[in-house]
A protein has these predicted regions:
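Ferredoxin-reductase
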Residues: 1-23
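Short, surface-exposed secondary-structure boundary micro-motifs
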Residues: 30-31, 180
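Short, Lys/Arg- and Gly-enriched loop/turn segments at beta-strand edges
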Residues: 32-43, 187
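A generic structural signal for residues embedded in beta-strands
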Residues: 27-28, 177
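Extended interfacial segments that mediate partner engagement and assembly in macromolecular machines
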Residues: 25, 32, 50-52, 57, ...
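Reductase modules of NAD(P)H-dependent flavoproteins
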Residues: 80, 84-192
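Structural motif
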Residues: 50-52, 78, 133
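Short glycine/serine/threonine-rich phosphate/pyrophosphate-binding segments
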Residues: 60-66, 142-145
Length: 192
């Protein structure tokens, strides 16, 4: 059994929202790309790292299994989840079981009003938290502002480029980007 987390925006996802457990898809591809970089790190070294995740909207879905994996290996990370409204906060119970969870909503309808970057800035500048790495997954604009903040705070940051994937094979080139001086494809080499 798999769980698919999506937001009904386009024609396909609007049709998907009407499917019930047990209904079938014609085709399904995934997972795409490579596992999280954490999976290849030495666990004892990873336990020394202070890690923060910033998730926006449905970007919370790929953050959860990473947090769960870390938790299963004795590592507790901080997680900041941002959503437009209370109704769009997902996986709260699951996330709080495997991380130190902070929630913010754009409209202030749940927990704290503001953006994930507001919480991250507060944790570092007002609460004295220090992080060795930040992982940001969510809308491109959210990841941009997380990167601007983490650059200012001198926190190395990993982003997920899954929003730009199209065909998942690297053939179309839509998810091509430069990492350093090397061409990478989010769907094959990423998404992080």
């Amino acid at each position: 059994t798999i769980t698919i987390v999506f937001m009904p925006i386009g024609e396909s996802t609007k049709k998907m929202k009407d499917l019930k457990a047990g209904d079938a898809f014609m085709d399904f591809v995934g997972p795409l790309g490579q596992p999280s970089e954490f999976c290849s790190e030495d666990i004892e070294e990873l336990k020394k790292k202070r890690i923060v995740f910033v998730a926006g909207g449905v970007g919370t879905a790929p953050v959860y299994p990473q947090l769960k994996w870390l938790h299963e290996h004795g590592i507790t990370a901080d997680a900041i989840v941002g959503a437009k409204t209370k109704d769009l906060v997902i996986l709260e119970k699951e996330m709080s079981a495997v991380s130190n969870l902070y929630i913010t909503t754009d409209d202030g309808s749940y927990v704290r009003k503001g953006m994930g970057t507001d919480v991250l800035r507060d944790l570092v500048q007002n609460q004295g938290k220090q992080y060795d790495v930040c992982v940001a997954i969510g809308p491109m604009i959210m990841m941009k502002f997380v990167c601007l903040l983490t650059k200012e705070l001198n926190i190395p940051t990993v982003v997920s480029m899954n929003p730009i994937m199209v065909d998942g094979t690297g053939m179309c080139g839509a998810c091509r980007l430069m990492v350093g001086n090397e061409v990478k494809f989010a769907c094959v080499d990423g998404p992080e």
